[in-house]
Curated annotation (Swiss-Prot):
<dbReference type="InterPro" id="IPR030390">
    <property type="entry name" value="MeTrfase_TrmA_AS"/>
</dbReference>
<keyword id="KW-0808">Transferase</keyword>
<feature type="binding site">
    <location>
        <position position="272"/>
    </location>
    <ligand>
        <name>S-adenosyl-L-methionine</name>
    </ligand>
</feature>
<feature type="binding site">
    <location>
        <position position="301"/>
    </location>
    <ligand>
        <name>S-adenosyl-L-methionine</name>
    </ligand>
</feature>
<feature type="binding site">
    <location>
        <position position="370"/>
    </location>
    <ligand>
        <name>S-adenosyl-L-methionine</name>
    </ligand>
</feature>
<feature type="binding site">
    <location>
        <position position="91"/>
    </location>
    <ligand>
        <name>[4Fe-4S] cluster</name>
    </ligand>
</feature>
<keyword id="KW-0698">rRNA processing</keyword>
<dbReference type="InterPro" id="IPR029063">
    <property type="entry name" value="SAM-dependent_MTases_sf"/>
</dbReference>
<feature type="binding site">
    <location>
        <position position="349"/>
    </location>
    <ligand>
        <name>S-adenosyl-L-methionine</name>
    </ligand>
</feature>
<dbReference type="GO" id="GO:0005506">
    <property type="term" value="F:iron ion binding"/>
</dbReference>
<dbReference type="InterPro" id="IPR030391">
    <property type="entry name" value="MeTrfase_TrmA_CS"/>
</dbReference>
<protein>
    <recommendedName>
        <fullName>23S rRNA (uracil(1939)-C(5))-methyltransferase RlmD</fullName>
        <ecNumber>2.1.1.190</ecNumber>
    </recommendedName>
</protein>
<feature type="active site" description="Nucleophile">
    <location>
        <position position="396"/>
    </location>
</feature>
<feature type="domain" description="TRAM">
    <location>
        <begin position="10"/>
        <end position="69"/>
    </location>
</feature>
<feature type="binding site">
    <location>
        <position position="306"/>
    </location>
    <ligand>
        <name>S-adenosyl-L-methionine</name>
    </ligand>
</feature>
<feature type="binding site">
    <location>
        <position position="88"/>
    </location>
    <ligand>
        <name>[4Fe-4S] cluster</name>
    </ligand>
</feature>
<dbReference type="InterPro" id="IPR001566">
    <property type="entry name" value="23S_rRNA_MeTrfase_RlmD"/>
</dbReference>
Length: 438
């Protein structure tokens, strides 16, 4: 007998306005209220506020709602610094005083560790940099506006592919922010502007970098206009005609300094966006490892050598492991350029068990790891089996840090220090550092 497909009825959403009391923030910075014992997530609401909301999504376990207005405001609320704040998808906590953002993130970090049954040890003071003008990297979205035939130039709207036109961003370092207006004007004048994909701006220690992604070659006039613009402003220029092709057109090779070491990079490479916090982060990690000249250190998820190269100046040997081979090759070159012969780099998939790797049979006294948001579940068994004296875990996701901490504790480690890094002020992103000792 034939069976006919019957599409499920789309769940209806109660669109009536409702008054709720906001009790806390979630790990992304949204306010949480409870309706019939079910959590409701409200972007833009703060603890202690009475909010008038409208549901936009209702599920079995939770709901999401739009903030209509505030019947009662928190004393910790402030006027957002940016004129685009309520549209732009970048920052989401500018309505909360910065010092209160720190408090909320600290509480969230401790809450997640406690939830996983991890005893936190000493809670150290947060690492902080500038509240504004801290981002040394930005990706500018571009799109032809069909109504005006001009480029939309800026950042994506909240939960949308549409673009908020931006000519000034208060969290960008001033060296980059100053170019937004003139860059918009230049790109709009190009004959081939419809072939533009996106733009990236990166602030290196030896200049500002402009990367232009394009899907067709520029004509000679457009190409020269780009070169002239960069020469007038002393910008380092890269053109990217394909996803895996990067052409260095003018300027020096970009680098940044960390602990007196030059880290060369391309605008495709990952680097930490907050220079001041990165410098303090590396300094604290090296301090927590309590290094001596006889130590052998393993640096997992090492990237270009942000930790590995400063480590190599203080210990006997360093081994850096990274999943992206291009970055491994550049890390090796960075070691050579800094005349560091006691550090070696290997490519490995750290999402998988690594005990059969050559480097995993080495005796390491200390281990540092700095994984992406997914954490380091694949390599934690290897870390535990290596039995180092000390492990420093740098995390950009407290949930995966809490999860991975459990395995170390099961293998006899104790979490002795925990601290927050204010890498991304005015956002819900929470970075942290944990020290484990046996």
């Amino acid at each position: 007998m034939a069976q006919f497909f019957k599409p499920k009825k789309k769940a209806s959403v109660n669109t009536k306005h409702l008054s709720v009391d906001v009790v806390r923030l979630d790990h992304n910075g949204a306010g949480i209220a409870f309706v019939d014992k079910k959590p409701v997530f409200i972007e833009g609401a703060l603890p202690g506020e009475k909010a008038i909301i409208q549901f936009i999504e209702q599920k079995k376990q939770f709901s999401r709602a739009k903030l209509i207005k505030l019947a009662q405001k928190s004393e910790k609320r402030q006027t957002p610094i940016c004129q685009h704040y309520h549209e732009c998808g970048g920052c989401n906590l500018q309505h909360l005083q910065h010092e209160e953002q720190i408090v909320a993130k600290n509480e969230k970090l401790q809450e997640l560790m406690k939830k996983q049954g991890v005893s936190q040890g000493e809670m150290v003071q947060p690492i902080m940099g500038e509240e504004l003008s801290y981002r040394r990297r930005a990706r500018i979205s571009l799109m032809i506006n069909k109504q005006t035939n001009q480029l939309d130039f800026g950042f994506r709207k909240k939960q949308s592919k549409a673009i908020v036109n931006v000519r000034h961003c208060p969290v960008l370092v001033q060296e980059l922010d100053q170019h937004l207006e003139s860059l918009f004007t230049l790109l709009n004048q190009l004959k081939g502007k419809k072939n533009l994909g996106h733009v990236e701006l990166v602030q290196a220690d030896n200049g500002s970098v402009l990367l232009i992604r394009h899907v067709a070659d520029f004509n000679e006039k457009d190409h020269q206009a780009l070169v002239n613009y960069c020469e007038e402003r002393n910008l380092i220029l890269y053109l990217m005609p394909e996803a895996d092709v990067l052409n260095h057109v003018r300027g020096e090779e970009p680098f940044y300094l960390i602990d007196g070491t030059k880290i060369y990079f391309t605008p495709k490479d990952f680097i930490q966006v907050n220079r001041k916090v990165n410098e303090q982060m590396v300094e604290q990690a090296l301090s927590w490892l309590d290094l001596n000249e006889n130590d052998s250190v393993l640096d997992l998820f090492c990237g270009l050598g942000n930790f590995s190269l400063p480590l190599a100046k203080k210990v006997k040997t360093v081994v850096g492991i990274e999943g992206v081979d291009d970055m491994v090759q550049r890390a090796k070159l960075n070691a050579e350029r800094n005349h560091l012969s006691n550090v070696s780099f290997y490519q490995a998939n750290l999402e998988e068990e690594a005990s059969d790797q050559v480097w995993a049979s080495t005796k390491f006294t200390k281990i540092l790891l700095d994984p992406a948001r997914a954490g380091a579940a694949g390599v934690m068994e290897t870390v535990a089996k290596l039995k180092p004296q000390t492990v420093v875990y740098v995390s950009c996701n407290p949930a995966t840090l809490a999860r991975d901490s459990q395995l170390l504790i099961q293998h006899g480690f104790k979490l002795t220090r925990l601290g927050m890094l204010d890498m991304f002020p005015h956002t819900g992103h929470l970075e942290s550092m944990a020290l484990f000792e046996r």
